[in-house]
Amino acid sequence: MQVQPTKYVGLVADLMPNIRLMQASGHFLFRYVTGPILIRKVYSWWTLAMVLIQFFAILGNLATNADDVNELTANTITTLFFTHSVTKFIYFAVNSENFYRTLAIWNQTNTHPLFAESDARYHSIALAKMRKLLVLVMATTVLSVVAWVTITFFGESVKTVLDKATNETYTVDIPRLPIKSWYPWNAMSGPAYIFSFIYQIYFLLFSMVQSNLADVMFCSWLLLACEQLQHLKGIMRSLMELSASLDTYRPNSSQLFRAISAGSKSELIINEEKDPDVKDFDLSGIYSSKADWGAQFRAPSTLQTFDENGRNGNPNGLTRKQEMMVRSAIKYWVERHKHVVRLVSAIGDTYGPALLLHMLTSTIKLTLLAYQATKIDGVNVYGLTVIGYLCYALAQVFLFCIFGNRLIEESSSVMEAAYSCHWYDGSEEAKTFVQIVCQQCQKAMTISGAKFFTVSLDLFASVLGAVVTYFMVLVQLK
């Protein structure tokens, strides 16, 4: 048995409620725990066994009721619905190291004294959105389970059977359970029925929670990346004003070095009459390549100066410390943007295959649901069930498409923000910096499903359009 430390930082601390729920639902998430890991492993394997047993029972029902087309279609939809949960559960277990690696990417973020308040503000915005998303998705999941169980008690509990001798269909009674399943015991009544009913409620809740929690973690990663891009765009104008103080006269230039936005009027760097000793101003905390990127060689923390003989010659009378802080601001922006790019790349590598499996399953399921929707003849149990399946399946696709689309929008607008700021008033360093930013940010950041498609609202629109088109064709052929 092993006990992990209880102090967490960065993205792990932000997603701790999500992580705790994933551990409670049985995910193979053995880090970030405070108790014996052996118990966690036994619990996860037990949960996997319980989920697989019920899933095989659903497959057994599909195999034993393949004669009637309507029954086969309905059972196939149910099987595909829970395939999401099983695949994501197993995928997380097999690919857990990549999840750990992605969570650890944001544990070594550095900030800059001039932009600390902006960084903290956008971090708090991202954190609030993560929590709201988690609450909303979990509430929807619980309500879906309640609705699924409730609708079980309405309508007839029968299935259609084909008589091969006469080629006619007839109905037979089946256990009134939330999910049609094949069991080796008689679940029509008695203790076997009660056990089967409770077991299926457990399966419903855990399987849907497991799948949705993994999606919420993916969307939370994208939320953080989007808010960090907002942070970088927000400080672009201030960065230009700071850089302008290096070679252009600016009245009250000392105001640039006050933390007014943080509620303090104290100077971040004191204007000293004499040329200060710069040894006590260490910039190594602002994204040192060795600590943050694992590079073999560490870049020097002392930034270059263009003053002759190392003397302060700028028109605003800035001290060496202030000059170094201004130049380090550009370094901070570039390295933070690289950090976001690295995070987005890790997100795609970690969750891309799961998105591909999700879309493949959803495409087949939505096609079958469009066929089932043509048979709705009123407000009844059948109609509500089909509409419920359809809305839930589309909501799952829309969830990660909307956040993937926002990432594209935020990353593509970085170049516009760089061009729109007063770059022409900045120093030569700043002008070169803006030019490089515009070149590097021409291509938007995207999340792909294992390189097969890009996660965006265009993907959702194409899926929805295909379903509607197929539905209209079936209606005309009916």
Curated annotation (Swiss-Prot):
Pfam families: 7tm_6 (PF02949). Glycans are attached at N167. Residues 1-41, 95-133, 210-338, 404-454 are cytoplasmic. It is a multi-pass membrane protein. One of its GO terms (biological process) is signal transduction. InterPro entries: 7tm6_olfct_rcpt (IPR004117). Residues 63-73, 155-188, 362-382, 476-478 are extracellular. Keywords: Behavior, Cell membrane, Glycoprotein, Membrane, Olfaction, Receptor, Sensory transduction, Transducer, Transmembrane, Transmembrane helix. GO terms for molecular function: coreceptor activity; odorant binding; olfactory receptor activity; taste receptor activity. The keyword Transmembrane helix applies. The chain crosses the membrane at residues 42-62, 74-94, 134-154, 189-209, 339-361, 383-403, 455-475. It is found in: Cell membrane. One of its GO terms (cellular component) is membrane. Expressed in olfactory and gustatory organs of both adult and immature stages. Highest expression is seen in adult antennae and the maxillary palps. Lower expression also seen in proboscis and legs. Within the antenna, expression originates in cell bodies and projects into the lumen of an individual sensillum, presumably along the dendritic extension of the neuron. Within the maxillary palps, expression is seen in a small number of cell bodies and in projections into the sensillar cone. Its main location: membrane. Heterodimer with conventional odorant receptors (ORs). Complexes exist early in the endomembrane system in olfactory sensory neurons (OSNs), coupling these complexes to the conserved ciliary trafficking pathway. The atypical heteromeric and topological design of the odorant receptors appears to be an insect-specific solution for odor recognition, making the OR/Orco complex an attractive target for the development of highly selective insect repellents to disrupt olfactory-mediated host-seeking behaviors of insect disease vectors. Odor-evoked OR currents are independent of known G-protein-coupled second messenger pathways. The homomeric Orco channel is thought to be a cyclic-nucleotide-gated ion channel that depolarizes the olfactory receptor neuron. Belongs to the insect chemoreceptor superfamily. Heteromeric odorant receptor channel (TC 1.A.69) family. Orco subfamily. Odorant coreceptor which complexes with conventional odorant receptors (ORs) to form odorant-sensing units, providing sensitive and prolonged odorant signaling and calcium permeability. Orco is a universal and integral part of the functional odorant receptor, involved in the dendritic localization of other olfactory receptors. Can form functional ion channels in the absence of an odor-binding OR. Plays a key role in preferred attraction of females for humans over non-human hosts for blood feeding. This is Odorant receptor coreceptor. The gene is Orco.
